[in-house]
Swiss-Prot record:
One of its GO terms (biological process) is humoral immune response. The gene is EBI3. Heterodimer with IL27/IL27A; not disulfide-linked. This heterodimer is known as interleukin IL-27. Heterodimer with IL12A; not disulfide-linked. This heterodimer is known as interleukin IL-35. Interacts with SQSTM1. This is Interleukin-27 subunit beta. It comes from Homo sapiens. Keywords: Cytokine, Glycoprotein, Repeat, Secreted, Signal.
Length: 229
């Protein structure tokens, strides 16, 4: 093979459009990861999205692992995924009140390379319960409205790891909600509500000891106060 022919072959192979192959995008995108302990203390659930890379339609798989502590050479364990292409995983071996953070590593594996995101967290700091369930309203005498609800079904031990609650409510046509709480029971009586008015009520939950953040608000429950009630 002459030197000229060899040079031509090298140039052709290094030019993806010339050889019919697709080259890698200009830059690999990083997974955007978030973790939440809505099932405290039995699990931490993490999920992620991957911004699309320019000019790429190739399938991407993910490898999710975690370690306890910031040491780069610490032992790692798999964060459980349903399939390699799943965009979520679960940590089931949760150490409570650990001073060392967990570090989740999510690696996106592309045909042309990989990109990784590292997310440190303390389990108690990412507690966010799911919304309370079964919110129901019962008009009572003397302009009172009873609100009852259940802890979120995903919260495994409400009798041990207690929750506190907030209520927000407004009557139909009002511009803003009134807010009541914290409440350490699963019922509450709203007083001085207006006769014939229709009320919208929602409930949110938080860890009793103030770890983490408030849940999202529950689905609204509605009730109309009768005349004389």
């Amino acid at each position: 093979m002459t030197p000229q022919l060899l040079l031509a072959l090298v140039l052709w192979a290094s030019c993806p459009p010339c050889s019919g192959r697709k080259g890698p995008p200009a830059a690999l995108t990083l997974p955007r990861v978030q973790c939440r302990a809505s099932r405290y203390p039995i699990a931490v659930d993490c999920s992620w999205t991957l911004p699309p890379a320019p000019n790429s339609t190739s399938p991407v798989s993910f490898i999710a692992t975690y370690r306890l502590g910031m040491a780069a050479r610490g032992h790692s364990w798999p964060c459980l995924q349903q399939t390699p292409t799943s965009t979520s995983c679960t940590i089931t071996d949760v150490q409570l009140f650990s001073m060392a953070p967990y570090v989740l590593n999510v690696t996106a594996v592309h045909p042309w390379g990989s990109s990784s995101s590292f997310v440190p967290f303390i389990t108690e700091h990412i507690i966010k319960p799911d919304p309370p369930e079964g919110v129901r309203l019962s008009p009572l005498a003397e302009r009172q409205l009873q609100v009852q609800w259940e802890p979120p079904g995903s919260w495994p031990f409400p009798e041990i790891f207690s929750l506190k609650y907030w209520i927000r409510y407004k009557r139909q046509g009002a511009a803003r909600f009134h807010r009541v709480g914290p409440i350490e029971a699963t019922s509450f009586i709203l007083r001085a509500v207006r006769p014939r008015a229709r009320y919208y009520v929602q409930v949110a939950a938080q860890d009793l000891t103030d770890y983490g953040e408030l849940s999202d608000w529950s689905l609204p429950a509605t009730a109309t106060m009768s005349l004389g009630k």
